């Protein structure tokens, strides 16, 4: 069985440390811990790393399409590698959770997250796993766009990093046992 873990974010140095790039940050850490490197796959508009974990093929994917078009990269990769959407996990930022809180879900709506909305649209299904990493709501007077495209202030930086570590621990646990429900029970 082949699995794919996608980290959502925006490409480029300008966005590297923004809240919207929590998925990229978590996937970068997971790739480092699995000792794999990303390479650009231009036909799929993505950075892709691959390895085997417990005898199963694993693809790590960072779409280069910008957040709101993530599905345009994810859907063709799933089709090309013949991966069922139930074996897809998407890591992303979550406005509705406090900074650093990690929540795992097996399916559902986008919850207003435009990258997830794009994946749902292009994959044609809501039945894929999600790892939501909390970034909190905007402070009074700040727009959602400005909030997600800003970095973490000093008081939240460490809490956000802890969330990334927890998300990666959850993915390593999932890759070891292959059971997302069991992973949800342990990490939610």
UniProtKB/Swiss-Prot annotation:
Gene Ontology CC terms, in alphabetical order: cytoplasm
Annotated site, Discriminates between blocked and unblocked aminoacyl-tRNA, chain positions: 10
Keyword Hydrolase listed: yes
This enzyme's EC code(s): 3.1.1.29
Primary location class: cytoplasm
Annotated positions for site Stabilizes the basic form of H active site to accept a proton: 93
Superkingdom field: Bacteria
Binding residues for tRNA: 15, 66, 68, 114
Catalytic activity: an N-acyl-L-alpha-aminoacyl-tRNA + H2O = an N-acyl-L-amino acid + a tRNA + H(+)
This protein's UniProt keywords: Cytoplasm, Hydrolase, RNA-binding, tRNA-binding
Active-site residues, Swiss-Prot/TrEMBL: 20 (proton acceptor)
HAMAP family: Pept_tRNA_hydro_bact
Name the record gives this protein: Peptidyl-tRNA hydrolase
Organism, as annotated: Lactococcus lactis subsp. cremoris (strain MG1363)
